[in-house]
Amino acid sequence: MGMFERDTEIYLDRDALREDYQPENLVGRDTELNRYRAALQPVINGEQPNNIFLYGKTGVGKTAGTRYLIDHLEEDAAKYEDIDLTVKMLNCDGLSSSYQIATRLVNEFRDETSQISTTGYPRATVYDMLWTELDSCGGTIYIVLDEVDHIEDDSILYQLPRARANDNLSSAKIGIIGISNDFSFRDDLSPKVKSSLCEEEIQFPAYDAKELIQILQQRADVAFHDGVLEDGVIELCAAYGAKDAGDARQSLDLLMKTGDLARDKDTDTISEDLVREARDVLERGRIQEGISGLTQHGHLVVYAMVTLDQEGKTPARTRDIRPRYTNFAEKAGIDPLVPRRMRDHLGELSMLGIISAIERNEGRRGGTYREYSLEMDPEMILAALEKTVDDVGIHKSVTNLVDAEATLSDFQST
């Protein structure tokens, strides 16, 4: 018998639970996909394509919906002899400047022997190369910029939609699809970029439990053998997903981790108890990974949120969080950040799912502001903040979670 043998009792097709799996039909996003399809319709009509901006939290179907509709758009466009459609999808994670985006796009249209370096060219030269490549391609070109909020300067977001109007292109018709996880990204765009990029805006809200059940059931039917899932497993995974900001990706990860635990334990079925065990494993890992990637100031902001949560003072506005954060920074021996930079850390924590942000509008008198709440287990967060708690000290609000006489390492081992 070999060291590795195939397991066939639990999974029929484990890959059906992965993020990149493309089902034949997308469920739970009918309203958004209908609006999205209508926004793409001008391509089939032979018209100038719309510029489309999608926004919503991670795991709510923006990228999956885009891939699904683009696949159908390319398939249907091929039926018409007068439509020449090209689609380029680019993930902007790790690309912080318009220059980097432009060079990547140039290389997307060139073969491997004609690639250009990502440094060393004047910006105007790179843009000229890009216009040449786009016009050489011709026809209708859709450029999909996923995680577009990573771009720190918005020059490319103005130049691309306006390229034809500015006489930089004569043959190609360009459309931009921008996908953002950051709700505030649109607000930070310059007015001229907003008017060009945001012709059609579609918000993808969080999934509710009913929609998550549809998604999980669709994937589970492909992923698992009949009879493996006990009653209530799908519903419990969906309930956790709805609680975790309506993130389908996290719900699928939870179902996969549960299946993996069942396989590791050599059980024949998947139970609700295994779901709870898998959730604990995933949440600890997610918190550790998210917090380890933060700066020292990010750690202090998280710690401030935990203490406010334990005092029953959340949801909290920035003005309520700042004094606690400032106090912790001083105790840690570092200068506190200005309010705007502290808000940036709150936004990052919200994107990571460690906290949630709700926008409030009280009209002219109260204005618009955001309230923040803790979304993950405070005990697990403290376990990941060992050095920060050591530097600042154990706040009185969390003494019930951390024994003041014990080290945090002792706490983690209990």
Swiss-Prot record:
Q: Does the keyword Nucleotide-binding apply?
A: yes
Q: Name one GO molecular function term.
A: ATP binding
The UniProt entry's GO biological process terms, in alphabetical order, are: DNA replication
Indicate which residues the UniProt annotation says bind ATP.
V60, G61, K62, T63, A64, Y207, R219
Q: Which Gene3D superfamilies match?
A: 1.10.8.60, P-loop containing nucleotide triphosphate hydrolases, Winged helix-like DNA-binding domain superfamily/Winged helix DNA-binding domain
Give a single Pfam family match.
Answer: AAA_22
Cross-referenced NCBIfam families: orc1/cdc6 family replication initiation protein
In which family does this protein belong, per the annotation?
Belongs to the CDC6/cdc18 family.
Q: What is this protein called?
A: ORC1-type DNA replication protein 11
Q: Organism source for this protein?
A: Haloarcula marismortui (strain ATCC 43049 / DSM 3752 / JCM 8966 / VKM B-1809) (Halobacterium marismortui)
Q: Which gene encodes it?
A: cdc6k
